[in-house]
From Swiss-Prot:
PROSITE patterns with a match to the protein in the record: TAT
Keyword Signal among UniProt keywords: yes
Organism (species): Pseudomonas savastanoi pv. phaseolicola (strain 1448A / Race 6) (Pseudomonas syringae pv. phaseolicola (strain 1448A / Race 6))
GO biological process: beta-glucan biosynthetic process
Name of the protein: Glucans biosynthesis protein D
Primary localization class, coarse: periplasm
Assigned GO CC terms: outer membrane-bounded periplasmic space
Length: 539
């Protein structure tokens, strides 16, 4: 599978023993849609099965779909609707429910679904059948859809919008998404990333089976288990999903097993899109001032430091690594939720959620990895973030990672210091208020403006001296200005970067503000791409 061809869309288990006669009574706690044989299930056995599976050669279960499904358009795929009369927990009459996605287009891997009675640890498979779906608006002749094709994924609903608006979606490979209070999907998470930026082709593991614990009528949390499989790894996952009024919180227990040596293992990966923003205008020749699902990578390092790294749409792939030990959290953030910043009434970038990872086990040494790919539009995800352990992963290794995911407008935690409000860049070398027109600077320079607010900046005594501390990996910085910004109750720091060589290597910039010995802000980190020497000139 190729990353750019992966569609972005809105195991046979070992025998666990026979079922006693008394177990038949437990069937009433299993979903009515489940029609398979009763079998035993618990998470410990799933973990053992995944580890055993890693000791065997990988066998792909990708199927050849009939042309009527393989050649569907996205409109046809979206028009095939799951029938809410056959929802997984319709007979529970509770707060939660599950619908399934039909296979089709690029979603060729059959995903098997099971209903679980958590009291008796018994499961039954939900088999694919025509009457689970409505085909009328799709133009698909269901008589040409034959066999037990499995499902492509599932979506979760919570009262009061059961069967109306889903709040969580698992669809394709190990991708999944959730909404926040704005009810708008945005960036995605994945179960595992393998070799996203390595010498060999990236590998996309699949969730091949899911088990859903049947909830009590008054339950408000989903409990879902998953088996992950790929040529290089297997995994057993437990998802505790709490769909709150303003956010979705997932607690994940991931047990990962390596089939082969893995050059680059990505834990808790997330995927997003950044085309253009306040600091990056190369691809913004549209009516929209900004186009992105996320605008920054935010990190709360193990040593307590907060870092803001604005995202880029580079001309060529760029990989950045931020070393850390036991990180407190990191995530991709959509910090600006003002409609005026996007002017978008179709996909509503102003309503996109942020995604924050909070480790709840010791992750040890490693790095937060950031991959930024070039994109010419808004339909391809070009941002990938994940945790990479420092210790090389060898065949036979087993690892356990526990973490929470917060899908919310902004992360659930923030620095008590001032935060980066916005980053801007443009022509430098002139005094503000004398923008070039009939006159141009003699020396080429690039100007950066970084706005800070919060953290008590608006309460600093008048006349407080504020000092920006800036470092760059090459070139030099000059012409600093610090401006009060009453509209955001903060300050703007501007400076010019001037080259000192012909190098076009990325410039790594780092800045924070302080007064005396007191640090006032989080750390701003930025990667700037200087133009070629022959382009460093004005008319």
């Amino acid at each position: 599978m190729n990353r750019r061809n992966l569609l972005k869309a809105s195991m046979a288990l070992a025998a666990y023993g026979s079922v006693s006669a008394s177990g038949l009574y437990a069937a009433r706690a299993l979903a009515a849609a489940a029609d398979g044989e009763i079998e035993h299930f618990d998470f410990a056995e799933l973990q053992a099965h995944a580890k055993k599976l890693a000791g065997k050669g990988y066998v792909s279960n990708k199927q050849v779909l009939p042309p009527v499904l393989a050649d569907m358009t996205p409109l046809q795929f979206n028009a095939i609707r799951y029938d809410p009369n056959h929802s997984l927990w319709k007979d529970v009459h509770g707060q939660l429910d599950v619908h399934f996605f039909h296979v089709g287009m690029g979603f060729k891997t059959p995903v098997r679904m099971y209903s679980v009675d958590p009291q008796n640890k018994q499961a039954r498979e939900v088999h694919f059948r025509h009457d689970l779906f409505n085909y009328e608006s799709s133009g698909i002749d269901k008589n040409l859809v034959k066999g037990d094709l499995g499902f492509a994924g599932f979506k979760l609903f919570k009262a009061p919008e059961i069967a109306i608006n889903d709040v969580v979606s698992f669809l394709g490979a190990s991708y999944f998404r959730a909404v926040d209070s704005n009810k708008q999907y945005g960036l995605s998470a994945r179960g595992l990333a393998i070799d996203s930026y390595a010498k060999r082709q990236e590998e996309f593991p699949d969730f091949t089976k899911f088990w859903f614990e049947t909830p009590d009528k008054n339950a408000t949390r989903f409990v879902v288990y998953a088996l992950l499989d790929s040529p290089s790894a297997t995994g057993a996952y437990r998802f505790d999903i709490d769909c709150q009024a303003g956010q979705v919180v997932m607690e994940i227990d991931a047990h990962i097993n390596a089939r082969t040596d893995i050059q680059q293992l990505g834990i808790s990966p997330m995927t997003s899109m950044f085309s253009c923003g306040t600091h990056e205008r190369r691809m913004c020749d549209t009516i929209h001032p900004q186009i992105h699902d996320s605008d920054r990578l935010s990190m709360w390092r193990g040593n307590g430091e907060w870092i803001c790294r604005p995202l880029n749409n580079p001309a060529k792939p760029q990989f950045s690594a931020f070393a850390d030990t036991d990180p407190k959290g990191f995530g991709l953030v959509q910090s600006d939720h003002e409609f005026s910043s996007y002017q978008d009434t179709v996909v509503w970038y102003s309503r996109r959620p942020s995604l924050w990872v909070e480790p709840i086990t010791a992750w040890g040494e490693g790095e937060v990895s950031l991959l930024e790919l070039p994109t010419t539009g808004e339909t391809m995800d070009n941002i990938v973030v994940f945790w990479t352990p420092k210790t090389p992963v060898k065949a036979g290794d087993s690892m356990n990672y526990g973490y929470k995911l917060f899908w919310s407008p902004l992360p659930p935690v923030s620095t008590p210091l001032a935060q980066v409000h916005a980053t801007r860049s443009g022509m430098g070398g002139f005094l503000e208020g004398w923008a070039p027109g009939e006159h141009y600077p003699k020396t080429w320079a690039r100007r950066f403006a970084v706005d800070f607010n919060g953290g008590g900046l608006d309460r600093l005594p008048e006349g407080t001296g504020i000092e920006p501390i800036v470092t760059v990996t090459h070139g030099k910085v000059q012409d600093f200005n610090i401006l009060v910004l009453p509209d955001i109750k903060g300050y703007r720091v501007t400076f010019d970067w001037v080259p000192d060589s012909d190098s076009v290597e990325p410039v790594e910039m780092r800045m924070f503000i302080r007064t005396g010995d007191r640090t006032l802000s989080e750390t701003w980190m930025y990667q700037y791409f200087p133009p070629a020497p022959d382009r460093r000139k004005y008319p």
